[in-house]
């Protein structure tokens, strides 16, 4: 798709335009002007106010902990519908620029994916930057996936049916985990990627077109990445999965993108790269919406369609 547009604001649908206007009028302070602790608190409190309310009902919601390679205990939350047989597992890795986000900010989304995908969802609270810079989040995500593969049965889950997913920075981490899983011969049914970051440098047309005024702005992207990674590491495929030497043999892939998002072009490029490598890819581009819309369901109803599409992709992958 081409992200060159003379009036990109005209692409926004009515609900998204209204939300952006309300946020602008509210004088929301930019994350880049906050400390990481302030930004996390702001997102934890403010984010859920724009998501579906009340939170969708799921039969089983349980806080658990997973073990990282250095002995760190990673908090996680298990969501599961009632089922007589062992459920398949989606490891979900939240977005937030590797710097913010939590089990709280993505609670509604994980409930939706569990309900609609008829699967267990394990939401991971991985360590954040700048306190824990690259590649800690990669290690935590991969360690969690391995833990579930080896120990998921202790939670009553089916470890032979495993998927990984995430949004934004979490989508990057999920894509990296899918590459690692292929190399480790750990079979995945699906990688589920909402607007993932895929490239080393943010220089696509969409990064210029949607740099300001579309929820995720350039200053915030720069702040996130300065928190997380040194310039010398930017070409590492564990930050930029597009840079992996080979994409053949990856799990079937579902990618959901927002049309008015700085990251949309790299998401399309990644889908094309996977297809060229022979990977089965289902790409959905949601018109008129912005980065982060899947956790803004109260404000942007298109989130519900994306939830349904992703849930269907999970269900189909686990039933194959």
Identify the residue ranges that each predicted region occupies.
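Alpha/beta-hydrolase active-site loop
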Residues: 132-153, 310
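Short beta-strand/loop motif that positions the catalytic acidic residue
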Residues: 255-257
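Short beta-strand element of the alpha/beta-hydrolase
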Residues: 86-95
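Gly/Ser-rich "nucleophile elbow"/oxyanion-hole loop immediately N-terminal to the catalytic nucleophile
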Residues: 149-164
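Hydrolase active-site cap/lid region
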Residues: 179-233
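Catalytic active-site module of serine/aspartate enzymes centered on a nucleophile-bearing elbow/loop
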Residues: 300-320
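A glycine/proline-hinged amphipathic helix-loop "lid/cap" segment
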Residues: 1-78, 319-320
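Short amphipathic alpha-helix adjacent to the substrate-entry channel of hydrolases
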Residues: 104-123
């Amino acid at each position: 798709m081409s992200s060159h547009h003379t009036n990109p604001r005209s692409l926004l649908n009515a609900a998204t335009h209204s939300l952006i206007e309300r946020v602008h009028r509210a004088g929301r302070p930019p994350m880049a002007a906050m400390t990481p602790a302030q930004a996390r608190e702001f997102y934890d409190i403010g984010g859920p106010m724009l998501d579906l309310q009340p939170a969708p009902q799921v039969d089983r919601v349980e806080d658990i902990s997973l073990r990282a390679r250095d002995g760190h205990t990673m908090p996680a939350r298990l969501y599961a519908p009632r089922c007589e047989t062992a459920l398949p597992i989606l490891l979900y890795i939240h977005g937030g620029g590797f710097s913010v986000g939590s089990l709280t900010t993505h609670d509604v989304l994980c409930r939706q994916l569990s309900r609609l995908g008829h699967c267990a969802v394990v939401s991971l609270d991985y360590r954040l930057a700048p306190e824990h810079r690259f590649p800690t989040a990669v290690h935590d995500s991969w360690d969690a996936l391995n833990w579930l593969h080896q120990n998921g049965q202790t939670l009553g889950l089916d470890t032979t049916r495993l998927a990984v997913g995430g949004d934004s920075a979490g989508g990057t981490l999920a894509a990296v985990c899918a590459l690692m899983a292929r190399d480790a011969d750990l079979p995945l049914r699906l990688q589920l990627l909402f607007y993932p970051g895929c490239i080393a440098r943010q220089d696509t047309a969409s990064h210029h077109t949607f740099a300001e005024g579309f929820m995720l702005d350039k200053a915030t992207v720069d702040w996130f990445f300065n928190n997380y990674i040194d310039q010398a590491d930017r070409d590492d495929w564990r930050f930029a999965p597009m840079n992996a030497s080979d994409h053949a043999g990856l799990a079937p892939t579902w990618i959901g993108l927002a049309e008015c998002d700085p990251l949309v072009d790299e998401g399309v490029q990644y889908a094309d790269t996977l297809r060229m490598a022979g990977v089965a890819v289902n790409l959905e581009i949601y018109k008129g919406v912005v980065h982060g819309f899947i956790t803004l369901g109260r404000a942007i109803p298109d989130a519900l369609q994306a939830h349904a599409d992703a849930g269907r992709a999970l269900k189909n992958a686990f039933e194959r």
